[in-house]
């Protein structure tokens, strides 16, 4: 028994060390999941960015089309592609900056779709209809990717903020990550009618 008492502090220290290592490794896994889901978000936004030049070129073929609307779409795309975020540093501020740029693209595309209602020939163009369908599908993929990202961030943040795990997180340099938030006015459903 005397022998056991002599090793008891070492046993307790070993158990604490193993617990800390397990917690650290779990946090690394959750951090990697956040990075993976972020890559999915970026990939879907990139797909949307890749569709925009084709959409703009299709619309440009209609001489009377409002040039200002096309210019705003191109400018919003350029601004959004200039905002790059390091996935290991997804702070709430940087994520808000990224989201603001992407919301600018969404807004410009929304205005473009509204203006296109005035051009029945354009709405009958098969290339335009294909691009429109691809864009709608991409917007859905973006929505799903953002939801999965937010879920991964919630799991990660819960893992690093709870006590006593927060001690391991502090020692390991794990920091809280930001969520995607809904855009201003997102609580009101937009009116979209491509059938006219």
Roles of regions detected by a PLM:
Residues 1-196:
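A helix-centric hydrophobic-segment signal that preferentially recognizes long
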């Amino acid at each position: 028994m005397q022998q056991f008492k002599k090793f008891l502090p070492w046993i307790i220290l070993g158990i604490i060390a193993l617990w800390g290592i397990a917690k650290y490794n779990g946090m690394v896994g959750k951090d990697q999941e956040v990075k993976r889901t972020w890559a999915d978000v970026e990939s879907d936004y990139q797909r949307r960015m890749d569709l925009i030049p084709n959409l703009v070129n299709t619309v440009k073929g209609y001489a009377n089309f409002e040039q200002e609307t096309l210019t705003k779409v191109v400018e919003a795309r350029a601004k959004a592609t200039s905002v790059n975020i390091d996935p290991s540093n997804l702070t709430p501020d940087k994520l808000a900056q990224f989201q603001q740029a992407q919301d600018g693209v969404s807004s410009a595309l929304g205005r473009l779709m509204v203006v296109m209602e005035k051009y029945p020939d354009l709405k009958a163009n098969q290339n335009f209809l294909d691009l429109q369908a691809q864009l709608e599908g991409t917007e859905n993929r973006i929505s799903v990717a953002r939801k999965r990202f937010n879920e991964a961030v919630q799991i990660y943040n819960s893992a690093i903020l709870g006590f006593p795990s927060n001690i391991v997180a502090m020692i390991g340099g794990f920091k809280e990550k930001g969520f995607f938030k809904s855009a201003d006015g997102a609580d009101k459903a937009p009116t979209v009618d491509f059938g006219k």
